[in-house]
A protein has these predicted regions:
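Non-transmembrane alpha-helical segments in soluble domains
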Residues: 23-26, 47-51, 74, 100, ...
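Predominantly a Rossmann-like dinucleotide-binding segment in NAD(P)-dependent oxidoreductases
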Residues: 83-85, 90-201
Length: 291
C-alpha cells in the first residue's frame, strides 16, 4: 500500500509489511540493494530472498545465526554475483580506523593481543523490542538471550580487533574458550516482564571469550547487556612496541624512540610507555595517521 510522508505525492512510498512482505519487495526490478534491520532471526531469510532475486544486500549484525547460514550467504553472493555486506558499524568508528592505520604501518610493532567488547546495559530498552504478538511478554531480544548461551552479540568488539590482527589476511582464529557468570539479572527480567519465575536463563550476565590464533595472537571478547555499568567496547591493542586503548580512556603509549620511528618528534625528553602520551604528541600521531 502507498502512504504519504506528509510532503506531497513526491514522497509517497510503497510499504511492504507482515511476515512475508519482504518477498514481494525483493521481486521488484527497480531495487538495487536491500538494507536489513529487523530482529536477528529475520536477517538471514530476508538476505537469502534478496540475493536469490538478484539484489545486493546490506545486513545489520549479526548477518546470520549459525555456520550453515553463513556459508549459504557466501554461496548465494558468489553464485548471483551480488554484494552481501555485514554492517558492522564499529569497524568504521573514527578511533578504530585511525588506530588500524597505525597498526598497519607498524606503529605498535607486532600486535600480539587485542580486546573488544559489547558492554551495554539494555535496561531502558528491553520493553521496546518487537514482540511477536499479545502473548509475547519478553520481546525478541530478551527471549533470544534466555534461550542461548555464550556471546550472542560478538561483532561490535570482534570486528575492529580482527582487522588489526589481520584475521583472514594471513592469520585465522584457531582455539576458543568461553566462560560466563550465572544469570541473575536475566532471570529477574523474565519475572518482571512475564510475571513468571524463570528457572532457566541460558545467557550469563557476563560472558568472556578467549581466542588464540594460528600465529599465536590472543583475542579477548566480553559481552554484558545486563548489569549497570558505563557503555564499553574496550578496543585495546597490545603490540611489541606500543599500546592503544579506547574505553574508558582514549590514548596511546609509545616510548620516545618508537614515536620518532613513527614519524612524530616527541616534545618531552622522558617520554615512555608507562602512561598515555601527552595530548600534543597524541594529536600529532593521530593527524599523521588519519585514515
Amino acid at each position: 500500500r502507498s502512504v504519504s510522508r506528509g510532503l506531497g505525492d513526491v514522497y509517497k512510498r510503497q510499504v511492504y509489511s507482515g511476515d512475508k512482505g519482504y518477498e514481494e519487495l525483493c521481486k521488484r526490478d527497480d531495487i538495487d540493494l536491500v538494507y536489513i534491520a529487523t530482529d536477528w532471526l529475520h536477517h538471514f531469510p530476508v538476505a537469502k530472498c534478496a540475493l536469490e532475486n538478484g539484489k545486493n544486500v546490506a545486513i545489520e549484525v549479526p548477518s546470520a545465526m549459525n555456520l550453515k547460514e553463513c556459508w549459504e550467504l557466501v554461496d548465494l553472493s558468489e553464485k548471483n554475483r551480488k554484494h552481501c555486506m555485514i554492517l558492522e558499524n564499529c569497524c568504521y568508528d573514527w578511533f578504530e580506523m585511525n588506530t588500524l592505520n597505525m597498526a598497519q604501518h607498524g606503529v605498535f610493532g607486532e600486535v600480539i593481543r587485542a580486546q573488544g567488547a559489547y558492554i551495554h546495559n539494555l535496561a531502558p530498552f528491553w520493553k521496546h523490542y518487537w514482540k511477536k504478538g499479545e502473548d509475547d511478554k519478553l520481546g525478541w531480544r530478551l527471549d533470544y538471550n534466555m534461550r542461548h548461551r555464550g556471546d550472542v552479540y560478538a561483532t561490535h568488539g570482534l570486528g575492529p580487533v580482527a582487522q588489526a590482527l589481520n584475521i583472514h589476511r594471513g592469520d585465522r582464529m584457531e582455539t576458543l574458550v568461553a566462560m560466563d557468570t550465572k544469570s541473575v539479572v536475566g532471570k529477574d527480567l523474565v519475572k518482571e516482564n512475564a510475571d513468571s519465575v524463570c528457572n532457566s536463563f541460558r545467557n550469563g550476565d557476563h560472558t568472556t571469550t578467549l581466542i588464540r590464533t594460528a600465529n599465536g595472537k590472543v583475542i579477548e571478547i566480553q559481552h554484558n547487556v545486563m548489569t549497570p555499568q558505563p557503555y564499553n567496547r574496550l578496543y585495546q591493542l597490545t603490540g611489541t612496541k606500543g599500546f592503544a586503548n579506547k574505553y574508558p580512556t582514549q590514548g596511546y603509549a609509545l616510548d620516545a624512540e618508537q614515536l620518532k620511528a613513527s614519524g612524530v618528534q616527541p616534545k618531552v625528553d622522558d617520554l615512555n610507555s608507562h602512561g598515555f602520551m601527552p595530548r600534543e604528541e597524541m594529536v600529532a600521531l593521530v593527524e599523521k595517521y588519519q585514515h
